[in-house]
Amino acid sequence: MAKMLGAGRWGGCRSWHNLRARRPQLRRTTPVLVAIVLLFAAAASAQEMEPRTFSPSPVGTNFVVFAVNHASGSVLVDPSLPVTDIHASNTVNVLGLGHVFDLFGRQALITGVLPYANADVTGNVGGNAREVQRSGLADAQAKLSVLLLGGKALTPGEFAQAHHGMVIGVSVGVMAPTGQYYPQYLINLGTNRWATRLEGGISIPRGRWMFEGSAGVGLYGDNDLFYPGERHKSQQSIKGLQGHVSYTFRPRMWVAFDGTWYTGGRVDLDGVRGADFQRNSRLGATFALPLTRRQSLKFAYSTGATTRLGGDFDTFSVAYQMVWFGKRPTPPQVAPPPGGGLPH
């Protein structure tokens, strides 16, 4: 449940109603504040860096992931606006599930993610210090990935004997408006809209090295209940590129160096175009460490390389993963007819 820190804080309080009364100032300030809101819609975002997204796995592989992601830093805004010294901190606890299956002879992976977030935003509006805290569910996510080239559906036994070369895959991800959202608050954990991310990528192994590249686009639905509950918000697509170079020390133990660049995402409010066009890049690293045959840890860090507008965040995450393999269903045994012979 949302927790407000006293009077005069951000979201559904007297200070924002006063801003609403001063419409010209609100119109100039709101696009920046929308950028802050969008910081908590991470999953379909082009900002995420995911090495080995299109790695092959045997059919029947299942996994569960428990992860903690923390992001904190400043939010860069148009200096002409009366909003300064904005700092945001967001910790997300994630439960994820995944299953690899055979889709028309190709390897396919379906995943689902349920995030719970704790967010804190501070800053100065018109020279007055403001702060807001939120705690609750963020928007749930699901993604389907299919390997089109180099991703034949294989059993664990077949997979162990196969040669794994270049892989080309595609994915479609969906973010559902299941997160905590209050129209009377400007800053929310949920977005009150649907979002879709389409991505295609290539993975090329060379000995212990792996080289990956991908391109994607995020598409966003409209929010007809934007603050203070009577405004229409739409957002243009965000296009992004990713690149990863990883090195495998031994099976399931590897390190990757990651980079991403993304652009777009301008927000329109009631048909008025905002000045919040993004063109940013990030760099990071990921390390995977096996604990047992079926358990592993993954550590990741990233930081802003160039930030034109929006969140200039440092992010750190740690994830625990457990893997198990399902069994193929055994065909039912049909009892022979009396007499032991085949039926005529």
What is each stretch, according to the model?
Residues 71-92, 130, 183-190:
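Surface-exposed strand-loop-strand hairpins of Gram-negative outer-membrane beta-barrel proteins
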Residues 60, 87-95, 135-142, 166, ...:
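Residues that define the transmembrane beta-barrel architecture of outer-membrane proteins
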Residues 62, 74-75, 105-108, 151-152, ...:
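Repeated loop/turn-to-beta-strand initiation elements of outer-membrane beta-barrel proteins
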Residues 66-68, 95-99, 142-148, 172, ...:
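Residues on the lipid-exposed face of transmembrane beta-strands in outer-membrane beta-barrel proteins
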Residues 68-74, 114-120, 148, 174-180, ...:
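Transmembrane beta-strands of outer-membrane beta-barrel pores
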Residues 225, 230-344:
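Outer membrane beta-barrel transmembrane domains
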Residues 118-234, 275-276:
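Outer-membrane pore/translocation modules
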